[in-house]
């Protein structure tokens, strides 16, 4: 009996100490996961289904009254504006290049950058995609990358489009700020509007008359691609600089008919040999490979 009494007293004391500590300091209560039923959903986590302003409800003419004829007209408007297929947008960062000279015309791909682009072209060929559109930034390094890729994939070179909106730039002041890269406020003002315009031009759900899934290839730049990813996934756009992607990498985003967006690849370069992987401008102007 004495052993049992001692055990009972010890157990009781343990429970008492536990509950005393819990009541004394509720902050030390440990939940079984980071999320729990008492945690409120952050405002920035809520999905905006009309982010591209192409939700059928925003395109249909509102009902004027509750009469059956008006309801039928409204429902017909909704149906007429419904997307039926997905849009796949594949973003390629240009290959490694040399930042020499004062103008873009002197910023050519290095030998390694050209090799990277060739590996990317072969990878895209292996994926067997039938491309609907190919668009490239009009900067030299993106044009050269696109030209090399086009030698590997099945697409009519005469149909390639160049776009000045896709030029490299400073999309939005990053958070957290970094000390090694501080553009002037005027550059963010100028580049940010242009890059946002590029996003709105190329990122939207399929038009209602699209008859199959479409595949668009865009050859561009690191800052622009990272900004596009944040905007498309509705992550805070200020976080774009937290993402790092290699030269000639593949980023694949899919926009479903409902307007939902998913990412299949982010900066994929697994098809490029490790010795040829880069993400920064090389220090040396010669003997890059």
Swiss-Prot record:
GO biological process, one term: protein dephosphorylation
Domain of life (superkingdom): Eukaryota
EC number: 3.1.3.16
Recorded catalytic activity of this chain's protein: O-phospho-L-seryl-[protein] + H2O = L-seryl-[protein] + phosphate; O-phospho-L-threonyl-[protein] + H2O = L-threonyl-[protein] + phosphate
An example Gene Ontology CC term for this record: mitochondrial outer membrane
Localization in the cell: Mitochondrion outer membrane
Predominant localisation class: mitochondrion
Family matches, as Pfam families: His_Phos_1 (PF00300)
Keywords: Hydrolase, Membrane, Mitochondrion, Mitochondrion outer membrane
MF terms in GO: phosphoprotein phosphatase activity; protein serine/threonine phosphatase activity
Disulfide bonds: none
Homology family: Belongs to the phosphoglycerate mutase family. BPG-dependent PGAM subfamily.
PANTHER family cross-referenced by the UniProt entry: PHOSPHOGLYCERATE MUTASE-RELATED, SERINE_THREONINE-PROTEIN PHOSPHATASE PGAM5, MITOCHONDRIAL
Role of this protein: Displays phosphatase activity for serine/threonine residues, and dephosphorylates and activates Pk92B kinase. Has apparently no phosphoglycerate mutase activity.
Subunit structure: Interacts with Pk92B/ASK1.
Protein name: Serine/threonine-protein phosphatase Pgam5, mitochondrial
Gene: Pgam5
């Amino acid at each position: 009996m004495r052993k049992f009494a001692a055990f009972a007293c010890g157990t009781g004391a343990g429970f008492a100490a536990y509950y005393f500590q819990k009541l004394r300091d509720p902050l030390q209560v440990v939940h079984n996961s980071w999320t729990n039923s008492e945690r409120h959903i952050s405002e920035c986590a809520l999905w905006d289904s009309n982010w591209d302003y192409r939700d059928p409800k925003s395109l249909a003419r509102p009902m004027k009254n509750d009469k059956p004829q008006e309801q039928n007209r409204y429902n017909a408007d909704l149906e007429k504006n419904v997307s039926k297929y997905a849009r796949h947008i594949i973003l390629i960062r240009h290959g490694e290049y040399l930042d020499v000279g004062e103008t873009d015309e002197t910023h050519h791909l290095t030998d390694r950058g050209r090799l990277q682009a060739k590996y990317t072209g072969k990878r895209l060929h292996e994926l067997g995609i039938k491309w609907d559109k190919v668009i490239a930034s009009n900067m030299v390094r993106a044009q050269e990358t696109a030209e090399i890729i086009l030698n590997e994939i099945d697409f009519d070179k005469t149909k390639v489009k160049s776009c000045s909106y896709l030029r490299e730039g400073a999309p939005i002041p990053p958070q957290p700020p970094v000390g090694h890269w501080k553009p002037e406020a005027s550059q963010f003002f100028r580049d940010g509007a242009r890059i946002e315009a590029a996003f709105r031009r190329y990122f939207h759900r399929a038009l209602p008359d699209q008859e199959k899934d479409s595949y668009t290839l865009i050859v561009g730049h690191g800052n622009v691609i990272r900004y596009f990813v944040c905007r498309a996934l509705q992550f805070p756009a200020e976080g774009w600089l937290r993402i790092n992607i290699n030269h000639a990498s593949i980023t694949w985003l899919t926009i479903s008919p409902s307007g939902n967006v998913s990412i299949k690849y982010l900066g994929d370069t697994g098809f490029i040999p490790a010795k040829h992987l880069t993400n920064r401008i090389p220090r040396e102007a010669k003997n890059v490979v």
